[in-house]
Design a protein with these regions (language model features):
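FAD-binding subdomain of flavoenzyme oxidoreductases
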Residues: 1-143
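Terminal amphipathic helices with adjacent charged low-complexity linkers/tails
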Residues: 37, 120-125, 146, 153-195
């Protein structure tokens, strides 16, 4: 969400999940060492077939190379564009020194298209400070706004969100959103919300 620059993204916080698969079976998803992953592939079930399929595809060097080439750079913190298949390549058994394989990293961004989440255990973070300040610089051009993002990100922000003219115009005549525009001055091309 909006505070992911401080706390990370959901896929990094999934400890375990209880999910309903397409055949009606229930699967427990949690971190698996390479040997536990292998045991999952030997199960005669849809869950076993899922792990077999993942192993078959991601063990293929050409596929892994293509994923690493075509997917967004992992250094880009918020790169939520589709399924995070590339994150699985950094886990055991695909990387010997990788963290335990957790299919939850993939399921977290799938919006229910791969399995229905019944229960989820997340790693919690400390609460944010009691008081916060929001700075909202206004810009005459989208380019100026975008050029300020990298310099402001060196500061320990909790939130850095851009709103461009398109979004701002959508709120202008919306009765529900009009009152939320109290901080917008004039007709900026863009603004940054910095907490």
């Amino acid at each position: 969400g909006t505070t992911s620059i401080r706390y990370g993204v959901t896929r990094d916080k999934v400890v375990r999940m209880k999910v309903l698969l397409s055949d009606g079976s229930v699967a427990q998803i949690e971190g698996l060492k390479a040997s536990e992953f292998k045991a999952k592939t030997e199960q005669d079930s849809l869950e076993g077939n899922i792990y077999k399929g993942i192993y078959k595809e991601l063990s293929n060097k050409d596929i892994a190379k293509s994923i690493n080439k075509e997917f967004p750079d992992p250094k880009i913190h918020r790169r939520n564009t589709g399924y995070a298949v590339d994150a699985l390549l950094d886990m055991q058994p695909f990387r010997e020194d990788g963290e335990a394989f957790n299919l939850g990293a993939l399921l977290a961004g799938s919006e229910g298209t791969l399995a229905l989440t019944m229960e989820i255990t997340l790693q919690l973070d400390a609460l944010p400070p009691t008081y916060a300040a929001m700075l909202v610089p206004h810009y005459h051009s989208l380019e100026d706004c975008l050029s300020d993002v990298a310099p402001v990100m060196i500061h320990p922000l909790f939130l850095c969100e851009m709103m461009d003219r398109v979004i701002l115009d959508c709120t202008k005549n919306n009765l529900e959103q009009k009152e939320n525009r109290f901080f917008v001055s004039g007709n900026p091309e863009a603004l940054l919300m910095l907490e």
